[in-house]
């Protein structure tokens, strides 16, 4: 541009010297100079505009970011406030005056129903019941998401009759007992190994080889398992994770007379044609010779010995032994394990006064429980089930059916009745009750019946079967204490 200006100056000087010859050229170049000035001014203005546009965009971005942060913070504060209001309602509900409750109902209960449903669905049975008393809306939602508590019936199995195997049910809540029914699907040598989810794991007690099968006494469906030629059932404790109709079902067996150097474990899944056998190092040789029942909880199988807790992980195929503080031993150990909401409990009925313990996982100790906080535990040789929600005389009790306990129990009832009769122990009164409470006998038998607690389907009622009338029973003339 400087060169162009010099050229124009030269032309102007030439014009002065030669005014007639260069007028047109000078005018032409003057126009070019004006155009260049206009372009320069436009360029300068455009640069400023672009700069301002960029600044404006930056301001817009900052404003949008501030707005989003404000919205996020508001929503977070609202969520925190909702949770605080919910906690206040739950904590103060039982002891709040009607006036204060009314104020809370107006201001604090305005929570989205989806949020209330989500929260109540994750509460325990006890907290769900408590939450349902807040207001009618909450009561309806709590009832819709409430997990039904387990029901337990006693299945009694008699193989000593000439007519063959018979069985029946006893509902301790309704205090009703069914009449006995024939069971041609089973042989007299059938034994019950384990009960869970309404199914029984059974075997032929006369066979040294573990001939096992699943049996559903409600549908009479039977599922045979392949022969287990390694584990003799008489020396092995068995359990299963869930109903065999589910793909996740796993049968677990552990040999309780394993050698001093190894623990033998067998597993089987529905659809498999053979068992899987594995040996694991026995880190505590003398501890796993007297095992109680096997507990399946949260994907793991647990076995309790005198001073340790054995844990088998079927996914990782690992066996671990966790030392725990020992519980005083009796000459004859009678123990069960069960679980409720992730907590593991142990019932020790080795003495005449049963004790209940809960596992403290952090400190590896069994903590003694004086009560069950409203729960109840049903115990038999093939099952141990913990329930919640029972009331009255069925709350905070241990309900036993065990041939070992029945044999040692002092009673005024005739021998055949005492050996074939369940009884409950109250943790409130620390005493046992032998009142039959509806458990009557159709006939007198000198053989010992087999009994196991079983969880019936929720769609089935004890009244779906023929109920034994007390007037037809043979033991109503005896006095039970």
Swiss-Prot record:
Residues 105-156 form the F-box domain. It comes from the Eukaryota. It holds the Pfam family F-box. SMART domains: FBOX. PANTHER family: F-BOX DOMAIN-CONTAINING PROTEIN, TRANSMEMBRANE PROTEIN. This is F-box protein At1g49360. It comes from Arabidopsis thaliana.
């Amino acid at each position: 541009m400087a060169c162009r200006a010099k050229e124009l100056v030269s032309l102007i000087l030439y014009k002065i010297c030669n005014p007639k010859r260069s007028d047109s050229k000078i005018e032409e170049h003057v126009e070019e100079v004006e155009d260049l000035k206009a372009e320069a001014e436009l360029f300068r203005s455009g640069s400023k505009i672009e700069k301002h546009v960029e600044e404006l965009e930056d301001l817009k971005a900052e404003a949008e970011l501030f707005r989003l942060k404000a919205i996020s913070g508001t929503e977070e504060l609202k969520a925190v406030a909702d949770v605080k209001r919910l906690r206040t309602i739950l904590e103060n509900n039982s002891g709040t005056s009607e006036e204060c409750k009314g104020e809370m109902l107006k201001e604090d209960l305005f929570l989205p129903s989806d949020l209330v449903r989500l929260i109540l669905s994750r509460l325990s049975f006890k907290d769900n019941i408590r939450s349902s008393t807040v207001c009618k809306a909450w009561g309806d939602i709590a009832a819709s998401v409430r997990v039904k508590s387990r029901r337990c019936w006693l299945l009694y199995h008699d193989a000593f009759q000439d007519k063959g195997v018979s069985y029946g049910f006893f509902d301790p809540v309704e205090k009703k007992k069914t009449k006995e029914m024939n069971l041609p699907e089973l042989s007299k040598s059938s034994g019950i190994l384990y009960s869970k989810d309404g199914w029984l794991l059974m075997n032929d007690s006369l066979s040294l080889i573990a001939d096992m099968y699943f049996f559903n006494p409600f549908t009479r469906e039977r599922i045979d398992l392949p022969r287990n030629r390694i584990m003799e059932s008489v020396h092995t404790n068995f359990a299963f994770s869930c109903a065999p109709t589910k793909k996740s079902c796993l049968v677990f067996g552990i040999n309780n007379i394993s050698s001093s150097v190894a623990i033998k474990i067998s597993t089987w899944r529905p659809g498999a044609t053979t068992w899987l056998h594995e040996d694991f190092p026995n880190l505590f040789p003398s501890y796993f010779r007297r095992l109680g029942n096997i507990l399946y909880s949260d994907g793991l199988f647990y076995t309790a010995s005198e001073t340790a807790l054995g844990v088998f992980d079927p996914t990782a195929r690992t066996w671990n032994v966790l030392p725990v503080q020992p519980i005083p031993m009796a000459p004859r150990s009678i123990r069960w394990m069960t679980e409720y909401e992730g907590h593991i409990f142990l019932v020790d009925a080795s003495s005449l006064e049963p004790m209940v313990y809960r596992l403290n996982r952090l400190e590896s100790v069994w903590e003694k429980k004086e009560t069950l906080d409203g729960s109840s535990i049903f115990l038999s040789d093939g099952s141990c089930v913990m329930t919640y929600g029972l009331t009255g005389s069925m709350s905070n009790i241990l309900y036993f059916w065990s041939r070992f306990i029945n044999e040692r129990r002092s009673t005024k009832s005739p021998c055949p009745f005492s050996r074939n009769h369940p009884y409950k122990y109250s943790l409130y009164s620390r005493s046992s009750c032998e009142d039959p409470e509806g458990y009557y006998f159709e006939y007198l038998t000198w053989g010992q019946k087999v009994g196991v607690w079983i969880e019936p389907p929720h769609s089935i009622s004890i009244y779906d079967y023929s109920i034994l009338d007390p007037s037809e029973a043979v033991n109503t003339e005896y006095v039970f204490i």
